[in-house]
Amino acid sequence: MEDFDGYPLGHGFINTSSKLTVRMLSRKKDTVVNEDFIEQRVRTAWEYRKATTDISSCRVIFGEADFLPGIVIDKFEDVLVVESLALGIDRLKPVILDKLKKVLAEDGILIRGIYERSDAKVRLQEGMERFKGFIGEPFDTKVEICENGVHYIVDVEDGRRPDFSWIRNTTVLQYRTCAVI
């Protein structure tokens, strides 16, 4: 991408159907967006998660925050849930998922299934159809996770949201010993 004077701004996706016309992947003009580039982005995101959070169940890829705009991938133990909200990144989704499985496997984490929850209305504004379903072989979509000593069953197929509301981590820690009446 270049500005009106031809000054290089970086590389990204342009979608004139979207309210967010441009989504930047890199601000460097010499960047080559290929599988190695995607793997490095995924690896950097995973290394950050390993350094900052409990990785048994977590948000592995958080869109723009990880310089992969328009895609969110949550990990629930050995299951991935993906939400793709931008046309450009949707086309890279198979590569992103392959690289993520590779990076996780290097840490001994084998993914048994991937479920896509790309059913948000915003996909229609991007010129994409809404989609919800398995990527690859079907599996039991009710996944048991343990967060801060509290066990949950997360329904990745029919749960309210594709994520687990990671914001409530501190609430769980604060109230995990309280009785509910």
Task: Label the predicted regions.
Residues M1-E77:
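Non-catalytic accessory regions of SAM-dependent methyltransferases
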Residues D78, Y152-V154, T170-T171:
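Conserved hydrophobic/aromatic pocket- or pore-lining residues that grip, position, or stack substrates
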Residues R23-V32, V81-K93:
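Short histidine-centered catalytic/ligand-binding loop motif
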Residues S18, G88-I89, R160-R161:
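Short, surface-exposed beta-strand-loop junctions and turns on beta-sheet-rich folds
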